[in-house]
Amino acid sequence: MAELSPMMQQYLEIKKQHKDEILFYRIGDFYEMFFDDALTASRELDLTLTGKQCGLEERAPMCGVPFHSYEGYVARLIAKGYKVAICEQVEDPAKAKGLVKRDIIRVVTPGTVIESSMLQDDKNNYIASIFLKGGAAGLCFADVSTGTAHITELKREKIAPAVIAELCRYHPSEVLMNPSLLDCREITAYLKKNMNCAVELVEEERYAPGLVSIALENQFGRDWPAKTGMAEDGLVRFAMAALLEYLHDTQIKGVERLKTVITYNEAQFMSLSPVTRANLELTETLRGREKRGTLLWVLDKTSTAMGKRMLRSWIEQPLVSSAAINRRLSAVESLVNQTMQRGDLIEQLHYIADLERLMTRAVYGSATPKEIYTMAQTCERLPDLRAQAESCSCPELTALAGQIDLLDDVKTAILAAIDPDAPSTLKDGGVIAKGYHSEVDELRSIRDNTKGVLAQLETRLRQETGIPKLKIGYNHVFGYFIEVSNSYKQMVPETYIRKQTLTSGERYITQELKELENKILGAHERLIALEHRLFAELLEKIGGQLDRIQRTANAVAELDVLAALAQVAAENNYCRPVVDDSDELTITEGRHPVVEQMLKGSLFVPNDTKLNCTTDRCLIITGPNMAGKSTYMRQNALIALMAQIGSFVPASSCHVGVVDAIFTRIGASDDLAAGQSTFMVEMTEVAEILKNATPKSLVVLDEIGRGTSTFDGMSIARAVVEHISDPAKGLGCKTLFATHYHELTDLEGSIEGVKNYNIAVKKRGEDITFLRRIIRGPADDSYGIEVAKLAGLPGTVTRRAHEVLRALEASAPKNKVEQMDFDALQEYSSPAVPSEMMEKLEALDVETLTPIEALNFLYELKKTLSGSLKG
């Protein structure tokens, strides 16, 4: 039987180590794929499938892509959930003895992409590492493209919702997890259904304490706890170590770039559940999942890629420290009030490249000459940028300016080394600047002027020897030689070495000519190799300034965000909110920031809001569909959130007492795939709100109780309002509650702090006009038929509906719902739970309970409860 060819043996040996990846195998100017990889790649990338003789009786399936444009193909495979192993030729084919050596230089995965062509400029690309143990978790979110990691630890009786909340905060494209996470179906189901990310299970052996310590020491040194903020006995060290080992396995080099570790506490930021993030459309719309129509779209006037990513981060993570918020607001206010300086600052920011990602590509050795020269051009702009920030006469901006390192040494090194017209690749040379390295200049001179160099040497040798007819020639056998006719042989110096005798004379070589020959014949190859080496040395030199460049990049990004927020505030007539630790949410003439921009050219009707935890705890809002209730409630939530990221807000005045969380239940969305109806989804979301909200939270609820019978729905809505708004029964937090149950308006007066509001409607005959104005008091009608008419129902249908309505109103003495005596409900209360049962429940260790033990325990509880009720 035929054997595999040597090259195919090499391929299969490498493939054996990377069974789960598509192997890009470099052959000349192409990356080739074979066997199953070729079948997959040809299908996913629409490549022509061919075959290659590999020594077997059949041809191996094969397809390929040009090496100079491979990134686009890799990006498409990554987007489809594949990993790609890049196998390069690691020796010069011209010098190889036999088969060219090849090796894996990196494995590209969704969370480890660093190529600018494969990344979104305005979005971080996080890889998450989660270590779960019981009711605690260590989490690490790293952006390999910027070299920054965020770490935290969570402890909860129910850990899954907390972990999911952090996943939603960072939106990782890849998640590493320990085997214990497989038992947490809530997290794994959420990852599968909602996160659209790759998941990698890390073997339990990788978490051995000894291996963890080695990984952390190798990356951060022996004093890693002090450098990173990780506790020596904390769970996050396991998550970080697993991430570092994964990066070492996939990236081969450059992992040292991951040096900036930011320890955070979830309590530093406003809590935003996944549902709230979606309902408020912070960074993507619910329907099209696009940027236009989101809060990010409105606020993004940033000039740099770094600023765009930071703005997104601020929106995803509003602050809860009033002092930190007001520092941001003061900087924004200073820029709002200084129009000229703001304009000059923004102009300077437009010239700043993406220092964060350029730095990473330099460390990983994948930066192009043009990118590095762009870094130098950015450094040239830093003095003007810093001076502009300092001129704003604002302590916060001056402090940021002080963090901008001018990076003179980096700029000087790059400008000295890189040619201003350097190409995008090293392939053809032309990268190193003239005068930077004498050998480069000499090799270029030889390559570009071989005839001239030989003529100069020939003239000099004639002068030195006195032989007027001395000539320099060349043939393929002897290479370059010096030819002297017989009549001048006696004048040839002793240092000349005779190589060939002719009838007419002699041919010689000299050491100088031999060296020149080597230079001429190998000038281009040696020039390319030398430029590669010098460029690599420059990248290493730049990489040594990692901390300085990272610090500068962060300062520039923050300046950019502050300038953008100021520009938006000035253009859209926003005001500075008063932010403190009170319980107030008072807004005068508030507007919805997004709807206002979408309605450019139309008048947006502003509305006032007054909420607190005493006299105005819960606003019950009634009125017809399409009148603007949801818009009004969302705008209040968005204004509070905008204030807490440090932004001015769309209002004439605003007072925001810091809220620790925003919870929303807006709209209906059946989860049929998971077997959940609209009502089930609604109740699940409301349950989460009731469990997690605090008196410092802002709750927005829209149409609670739909999807079930009228009595059931109304009863649930009533109970929810009581629990949320009445401190004696539950939370007493600030709440906006929209409802079609007009009976709930009776709660004003019976529960302190509950107030009725409605959307003003103007009616003429059977036609209505929505005035979009929020006014005190309950709505006088639901206007359901009128809304149906506006929605386009045929006139015959709406007229018939009016007839039926009049008949029902005439025949029915009183709707049963209207006869409900809610006050009578106060007399009823739930039966007391026996203290014995409570003691058993409190002593129960849910984490260690087996299914059989759980059933037995439930049986005993039922017996106890039955006996108690009978007694």
For the regions a protein language model found, what residue spans apply to each?
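Charged catalytic and DNA/RNA-contacting regions of genome-maintenance
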Residues: 1-334, 350, 354-363, 367-459, ...
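Charged, surface-exposed helical/loop "interaction arms" that form contiguous linear patches used
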Residues: 364, 368, 378-381, 399-402, ...
